[in-house]
Amino acid sequence: MTFALGQRWISDTESDLGLGTVVAMDARTVTLMFAASEENRVYARNDAPVTRVTFNVGDVIDCQEGWSLKVEEVLEDEGLYTYFGTREDTQETAVVLREIFLSNQIRFNKPQDKLYAGQIDRMDNFVLRYRALTNQFEQHKSPMRGLCGMRAGLIPHQLYIAHEVGRRHAPRVLLADEVGLGKTIEAGMIIHQQVLSGRAERILIVVPETLQHQWLVEMMRRFNLHFSIFDEERCIEAFADAENPFDTQQYVLCSLDFLRKSRKRFEQALEGEWDLLVVDEAHHLEWSQDKPSREYQVVEGLAERTPGVLLLTATPEQLGRESHFARLRLLDPDRFYDYEAFVEEEEQYAPVADAITSLFSGEKLPDEAKNQITELLSEQDVEPLFRIIESNSDEEAKASARQELIDNLMDRHGTGRVLFRNTRAAIKGFPTRNVHLMPMDIPQQYTTSMRVAGMIGGKMSSEARAMKNLYPEEIFQEFEGDDASWWQFDSRVNWLLEKVKEKRGEKILVIASRASTALQLEQALREREGIRATVFHEGMSILERDKAAAYFAQEEGGAQVLICSEIGSEGRNFQFANQLVMFDLPFNPDLLEQRIGRLDRIGQNRDIDIHVPYLKGTSQAILARWFDEGLNAFAETCPTGRAVYDKYSDALIEILASGDTSTLDEIIEESAKLNKELKSQLEQGRDRLLEMHSNGGEKAQQIVEKIESTDGDTNLVTFALSLFDTIGLNQDDKGENALVVTPSEHMMVPSYPGLPYEGATITFDRDTALSREDMHFISWEHPMIQGGIDLLMSEGVGTSAVSLLKNKALPVGTILLELIYAVDAQAPKRSGITRFLPKTPIRLMMDSRGNDLSAQVEFEGFNRQLSPVNRHLGSKLVTSVQKDVHRLIEAGDVLVEEKVEAVRKQAQQDMQQSLNTELERLQALKAVNPNIRDEEIEAIEAQIKELTGYINQAQVQLDSLRLIVVSHN
């Protein structure tokens, strides 16, 4: 390297310093001053990591005074360059610019500039960049985008609802699946799709206070969506950053109570300009025509101002008709304006349901059914379809004709677009429940303490006394003090220890009402038998609960028993276990259902054993009988339980408080009778039509198959590992399909997106991720992959490379130039541009004559024949063929235009076809189904117009290039 004072060089390792000037030299070192960043660097002369900056004829260069020069001639004198040419601003000719006056800010951002400046990247980085571009393009175009990356089993009805609703513009929908069918996951999938497609940027979730953490965890664990819980404290903190605290976060989660109690916070939430509002447990919003509750008004206010609304609620039958109408009114007040009209309309659906039932049966259609269908579809000619169904055509043609009729009828079915509801009856795949009720002798110690408590507790209300009597161990402890070890003599504990030993290989979930009971049970198992157990209660942080859940889930060396308190277990699911022990019983059938629902969920592969040990002659024994004989609530899900409970709870409280069981048999008998009546009403009122629509039938199955085919994509694994390598993350193989990824000191950026400071355990396997909550499930949609790709693009990794091709058939020194262009439409994400024209890579492979060989030379196969070169040799090769490279880039720029035009044309065609089909369908439906909102139609019309403009203006630029030189050795 020969240096001279005043020469301009650029640092290879710190390109952001700008252009440096040689300001001092001695025999061993050279000093460069980087004026743009006000830094000096001293390098050893013989191997300084710097590259000489030289420009060629045709380049445009900037002067320190702010004007630019188009170079026409370059002279070198004593190691310094002088450039001659024309000023760009004044068009003055024969202007002289000495290199000392070059702008210090010059950065080599264009790939060709980096190549000429010797800033040559590693060959594998170039390959990684190209793969990132192509994979990202394919992901954006996929119709399953937003559904593949969630940590959840592939359950057809959930995926169907999410796919159906998630693609709509500002969906307004009621999700009313029965318990255990996964409404939260459906809502999460819809949110995830809306976020990825850019349709929703600001989201507000309103839930009952007890469910806040569950939602926070579910959104983070399953969908990598990080919500912030807002309460009064958080709002006061946020006030420092913004007038309206809700403006400080994009994804907000808060309780309904919080908005109800404070008018100020409610008004601030109203001004939050949300794109999507999600309300869980919406059946608790009470409404009547003359007097809506305050909670209802809060949600109504938010729903009026928010374009997209998801309401999650119990099934409509549990709600009753009026209450169900009130939910629909929140979604579309113009359409559901009058309760009487709604009732009348509902009654008209009976013939539609009958018609569909006869189509589904696959048998010959009776004339009556045909007349009904013809009448219902009066605006279309259905005769040809009837003919196909009755002809001797193949089964497939018949099935598709039936399906077409069904689809058309479904579309006309009033609430089909607004309401989705699945029942266990309509969905297969639930386990059987085996119930074991075990009466046990009551220890003497309890009898004494309960008798004494009965004498002193005269002033308590019946309800308080009934609650207290449910937990004899707490009464005993009150008398004996906190050190009292009731678990040394409690017969339920003795039974539990035996049970756990008997089921050595099985995971057992124990649920108790109180956190204190759960903690003491763990102590009993540990101290009396050395059994590995872990606890889960509301006093623990989310992270601690996760660790406990992961310890329980571990196959080897994990806990055999997990003991949960009532609140601690809310919203957590342990499908991998099938043994449930209820150490005590909750007072309310909904809570009982929730306990069983921890194991009895869609996705449970085995039958469930439910063990209920209870002490004879206590309140627990009374409750156990009522749940079992009155409601059959242990053996079956009990959608009617709440209604029966509301009717008989006062009588039950009296019995539990006084211990007088003389009326118990009568209450059990009446409860069972009422329960039976309510259940048969439910069965008759089952809206089969709605069920057919909600579970998606064949379509749902196809979605599952499509996603299954992308699971376990080896392409993703290879890509992710090279991405982590390039960015500088440490990777340790953990076995069991798992890797541990941690930040290193040599990372390209100080913190990696989506990766916690302490690192993370990741897996690419869906089943592993489902059984291990502490692992991240990596898919193309995961922030670690998306963020990594964004990093590659923004940091300019792999934009220029040089490779050698060893091929004796070609003369030594032959060059090829691989050019990667990217077509990009500058448009806001919410416009939906990425569906039709995401960033699209176009690859050209130029030979030395300027022909494009990309059609004959496939990327991956060709890449395997190339070998990398070091930066020094690469720089020399570039310098020797720089003029040829210039010429080939110019030829490439001309050739690529034709391909860009084809890309634009294809995007326009896809967009017009997709959106016009949807538009025509909605317009046709509008005539017969008032559930189509005008806004939906207007939104699509506006979107078509907007996208046409964006696609026409899409630009192309050179993203990266690779020079390939033929050698023989």
Swiss-Prot record:
A motif (DEAH box) lies at residues 280-283. The keyword NAD does not apply. Keywords: Activator, ATP-binding, DNA-binding, Helicase, Hydrolase, Nucleotide-binding, Transcription, Transcription regulation. Residues 492-686 form the Helicase C-terminal domain. Residues 164-334 form the Helicase ATP-binding domain. One of its GO terms (biological process) is regulation of DNA-templated transcription. Its EC number is 3.6.4.-. Belongs to the SNF2/RAD54 helicase family. RapA subfamily. Interacts with the RNAP. Has a higher affinity for the core RNAP than for the holoenzyme. Its ATPase activity is stimulated by binding to RNAP. HAMAP family: Helicase_RapA (MF_01821). Transcription regulator that activates transcription by stimulating RNA polymerase (RNAP) recycling in case of stress conditions such as supercoiled DNA or high salt concentrations. Probably acts by releasing the RNAP, when it is trapped or immobilized on tightly supercoiled DNA. Does not activate transcription on linear DNA. Probably not involved in DNA repair. This is RNA polymerase-associated protein RapA. The lineage of its organism: Bacteria, Pseudomonadati, Pseudomonadota, Gammaproteobacteria, Vibrionales.
